[in-house]
Amino acid sequence: GILDSLKNLAKNAAQILLNKASCKLSGQC
């Protein structure tokens, strides 16, 4: 459903942000 799609989008966005943050913190960008 729509709610499931939104939840998946939110999860993906959060994962991308976490990856970018950890990348910057570790200096491996």
From Swiss-Prot:
Subcellular location as annotated: Secreted
Tissue-specificity statement: Expressed by the skin glands.
Disulfide pairings: C23-C29
Pfam families according to UniProt: Antimicrobial_2 (PF08023)
Keywords for the protein's UniProt record, in alphabetical order: Amphibian defense peptide, Antibiotic, Antimicrobial, Disulfide bond, Secreted
Annotated GO CC locations: extracellular region
Function according to Swiss-Prot or TrEMBL: Antimicrobial peptide.
Protein name stated in the entry: Brevinin-2Rd
Organism (species): Pelophylax ridibundus
